[in-house]
C-alpha cells in the first residue's frame, strides 16, 4: 500500500470564474527550508502580536535613526522617539522619513519638516531674498531621502528634485540645488538612495544620479547615470523598499500589467508568481498607488511585505530557491486585511504600528494571536490523482505541547479544486503532550482527483510538516 507525500508549501486549485488553475497560498504560515523528518521543510505560523503601548493614532511611518540609536515612528499626529513624544506631525496620511546628524526629517503635507535633536523644528524653505542666493520654486514635497550629509526631496508633479545645503539643512543648496530626471516627464513618484546614488522612481523609468565631485561654485553636484537606468516604473510613492541589497518595487501599469520586481545592475528580475500578478491585476491604478512595501528579517527569513488595500502579501527570499515562495497574512477569522504595519527591529524585539487602532505592538514568537485574539491559519495540498482508490491515514507532523488548551485541526477535502466538503475535526495540540499524532484514519474512496485543506484556529504557535496519506 503506497504512501504518498503531499507538499504544503503551495496548494493548487481552480478558479470557478474562468476555469484556470490557481495557487492556494498559505495563510498566516511561513515556509522554512530545513530537513525535518523526511520533509524538505516545514511551515510555521507568523509570529503573533502583543500590545506594547498606546499612541496618538494609526501608524504612518517608521525609521531607525542611527544618529540617535533610536526608532522614530509617526503615529496619528505625533512623532515618537521610542515610546516618548518628540513633536507634532500634521495630516493623517503616510509620511516619508529620513535622518541626519542633527535632525529627523519628515515629509508631510508637501513640506520637509526637520525635528532637530535640540528640540527646535524647522521647515525647509528658500534662503532670504537679501542673501543673494538663488530663489527656487520649491513646490510641494512628495518624497524625501538623505545622502552624504544632505536631504534630497522630489517636487510633486514635476521631474525636479532638490538637495539641501551642507551648512544649513533648512535651506536648499545655495548654488546648485535643483536637478531633473528628464526621462520622467510625468513626474518623480518616489526618491531613495542606493549605495552612493540618488534613485528617482518614475512611472516608466527608474533613474540613478551620482556625485560629480565638482567643487566649482555653480557646478552640478549630481549627474545622471544612464547605464543604470531601468525601464520600469513604480505604482506609488511607497511601492518600493530596500530589499536584498537593492530595491524591490511594484511596477506601474504604465509599463504593462503590474508585477513585483527586484532591481539588479540596470535590470529588473520578476519575483511574482502568476497568482500574485492576478491579485495585483485586480486593483485599479489608484488603489495600487496606495500600496506600502517594507522588508523584515528574522530567524533567517528574508521577508518582503506588501500592504495592499485588500491583501497583505509576503515574499520569502530564503525559501524561494525552487521558485518564488509567497504567503498571505490576514487578521481575524474571515478575510480582513492584516492589521500590523511598519515593522522594525528595536532593542531585541520587532515592533510594529497598527492600521486600525492607536497602539503599537511587538512580535512574539511563542504566540500566533494578534492582541489576544485567535487567528486562522490555512494550508492547502495540490490536487493529485487517485483514480478509484481508497485513502487512509492522512497524517501531518505537528510540533505540539505548547498550547494552553486542546486545539483542533480542521481537515476538509476537494475533488474539483473549488468546493471543499465537510470539515473533519482532529485534535492537533494539547498542553505538555509533545508527541501527539495528527491522524485522519479513514478518509474515504476517491473517484478521480483529491486535494486537502488544513485549517487551524488558535492563539498558540503552529508548526506543521510532512503531510502524507496511504492509498490502496
Descriptions of predicted regions:
Residues 107, 201, 389:
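Residues that form or flank phosphate/diphosphate-binding pockets in enzymes
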Amino acid at each position: 500500500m503506497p504512501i504518498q507525500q503531499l507538499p504544503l508549501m503551495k496548494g493548487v486549485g481552480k478558479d470557478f470564474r474562468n476555469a484556470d488553475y490557481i495557487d492556494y497560498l498559505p495563510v498566516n504560515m511561513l515556509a522554512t527550508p530545513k530537513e525535518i523528518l523526511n520533509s524538505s521543510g516545514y511551515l510555521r505560523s507568523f509570529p503573533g502580536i502583543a500590545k506594547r503601548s498606546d499612541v496618538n493614532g494609526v501608524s504612518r511611518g517608521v525609521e531607525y535613526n542611527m544618529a540617535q540609536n533610536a526608532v522614530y515612528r509617526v503615529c496619528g499626529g505625533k512623532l515618537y522617539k521610542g515610546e516618548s513624544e518628540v513633536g507634532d506631525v500634521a495630516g493623517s496620511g503616510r509620511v516619508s522619513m529620513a535622518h541626519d546628524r542633527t535632525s529627523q526629517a519628515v515629509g508631510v503635507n508637501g513640506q520637509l519638516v526637520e525635528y532637530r535633536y535640540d528640540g527646535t523644528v524647522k521647515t525647509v524653505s528658500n534662503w532670504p531674498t537679501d542673501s543673494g542666493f538663488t530663489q527656487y520654486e520649491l513646490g510641494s514635497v512628495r518624497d524625501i531621502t538623505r545622502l552624504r550629509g544632505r536631504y534630497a526631496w522630489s517636487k510633486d508633479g514635476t521631474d525636479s528634485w532638490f538637495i539641501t545645503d551642507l551648512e544649513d539643512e533648512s535651506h536648499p543648496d545655495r548654488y546648485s540645488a535643483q536637478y531633473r530626471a528628464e526621462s520622467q516627464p510625468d513626474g518623480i513618484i518616489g526618491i531613495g538612495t542606493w549605495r552612493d546614488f540618488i534613485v528617482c522612481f518614475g512611472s516608466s523609468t527608474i533613474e540613478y544620479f551620482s556625485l560629480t565631485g565638482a567643487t566649482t561654485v555653480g557646478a552640478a553636484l549630481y549627474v545622471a547615470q544612464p547605464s543604470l537606468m531601468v525601464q520600469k516604473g513604480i505604482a506609488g510613492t511607497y511601492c518600493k523598499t530596500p530589499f536584498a541589497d537593492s530595491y524591490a518595487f511594484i511596477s506601474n501599469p504604465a509599463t504593462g500589467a503590474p508585477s513585483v520586481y527586484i532591481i539588479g545592475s540596470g535590470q529588473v528580475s520578476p519575483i511574482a508568481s502568476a497568482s500574485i500578478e492576478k491579485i495585483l491585476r485586480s486593483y485599479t491604478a489608484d488603489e495600487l498607488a496606495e500600496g506600502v512595501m517594507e522588508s523584515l528579517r528574522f530567524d533567517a527569513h528574508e521577508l518582503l511585505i506588501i500592504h495592499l488595500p485588500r491583501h497583505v502579501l509576503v515574499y520569502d527570499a530564503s525559501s524561494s530557491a525552487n521558485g518564488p515562495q509567497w504567503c498571505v497574512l490576514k487578521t481575524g477569522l474571515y478575510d480582513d486585511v492584516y492589521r500590523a504595519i511598519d515593522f522594525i527591529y528595536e532593542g531585541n524585539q520587532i515592533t510594529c504600528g497598527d492600521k486600525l487602532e492607536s497602539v503599537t505592538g511587538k512580535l512574539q514568537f511563542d504566540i500566533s494571536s494578534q492582541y489576544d485574539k485567535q487567528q486562522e491559519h490555512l494550508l492547502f495540498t495540490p490536487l493529485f490523482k487517485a483514480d478509484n482508490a481508497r485513502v487512509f491515514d492522512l497524517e501531518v507532523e505537528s510540533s505540539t505541547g505548547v498550547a494552553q488548551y486542546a486545539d483542533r485541526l480542521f481537515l476538509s477535502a476537494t475533488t474539483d479544486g473549488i468546493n471543499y466538503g465537510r470539515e473533519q475535526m482532529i485534535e492537533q495540540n494539547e498542553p505538555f503532550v509533545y508527541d501527539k499524532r495528527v491522524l485522519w484514519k479513514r478518509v474515504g474512496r476517491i473517484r478521480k482527483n483529491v486535494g486537502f485543506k488544513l485549517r487551524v484556529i488558535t492563539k498558540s504557535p503552529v508548526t506543521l510538516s510532512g503531510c502524507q496519506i496511504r492509498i490502496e
